[in-house]
Every structure is written in C-alpha cells, then in structure tokens.
Curated annotation (Swiss-Prot):
This is Aspartate 1-decarboxylase. Heterooctamer of four alpha and four beta subunits. It comes from the Bacteria. One of its GO terms (molecular function) is aspartate 1-decarboxylase activity. Signal peptide: none annotated. Is synthesized initially as an inactive proenzyme, which is activated by self-cleavage at a specific serine bond to produce a beta-subunit with a hydroxyl group at its C-terminus and an alpha-subunit with a pyruvoyl group at its N-terminus. Its cofactor is pyruvate.
Length: 126
C-alpha cells in the first residue's frame, strides 16, 4: 500500500513578490529549494497563514541567495506581499519506506533568513 507523507516544507516564508502577469508558479530562492529537497516544476501546496488561502502550484527557481518567494500568475491573487506562507511538498511511498523516511523542514524568519532545518516536529503539548 502507498501512503502520502510530507516530503519537505518551507515554514513561515514571507512573500516577497506577487506577479500577476508572470507565468503561473511560485518562484523560490534556489537555496531554499535545495534545503527543502524540492525540485524545479514540482507540485507544491501553499498555505497562507495570514488569510487562510490554500492552493496548489509548482516550483520555479529564483536566484540563489535572493530570499525570493514570488507568487506568480493566478496565485498572485491569493497573497499580498508580506504574507507568511507554508510551502509544502508531499511524496507517495510504501509503508516500509515511510518507516525510515525523514522530511526536510526549513524554518524561515521574518526576513526569509533560514532559522533552522530539521526533520522532526515536536509533539504538540495538550
């Protein structure tokens, strides 16, 4: 049986651009793409923490080191520059593969600097 698990995410990324007339996609700093284990043209889910919007698009590369998170095309209507978003990618795998799988989690600060990377999320306290 195949199950779907979180593969990688950028947590609390700040939207730096919203380009309505650019080809639809999400441009992400190439360094962030590598840290989160994402790929160019990979499908991603975007969760807008500021307005609750949730939508799908795909990754395109932005200049490495630029800290760019740009929502393009129709996705630009779902955000405002400055919004904080979670960008997530998922992967299907067997249960046996899932037993040893670890996601790549990248936490960003308010300026899109990497705060930390990890492969676990602490248990939520009651």
């Amino acid at each position: 049986m195949q199950i779907t698990l979180l593969k990688g995410k950028l947590h609390m990324a700040k939207v730096t651009q919203a380009e309505l007339w650019y080809d639809g996609s999400c441009a992400i700093d190439e360094e962030f793409v590598k840290l989160a284990g994402l790929r160019e043209f990979e499908q991603i889910e975007i969760y807008n923490v500021d307005n609750g919007e949730r939508f799908s698009t795909y990754v395109i590369l932005a200049e490495a080191g630029s800290r760019t998170i740009s929502m393009n095309g129709a996705a630009a209507r779902k955000v405002q520059v400055g919004d904080r978003v979670i960008i997530a990618a998922y992967s299907q795998m067997s249960e046996a593969e899932a037993d040893s799988f670890k996601p790549r989690l990248v936490y960003l600060d308010k300026d899109n600097a990497v705060e930390r990377t990890t492969n676990t999320i602490p248990v939520q306290a009651a």
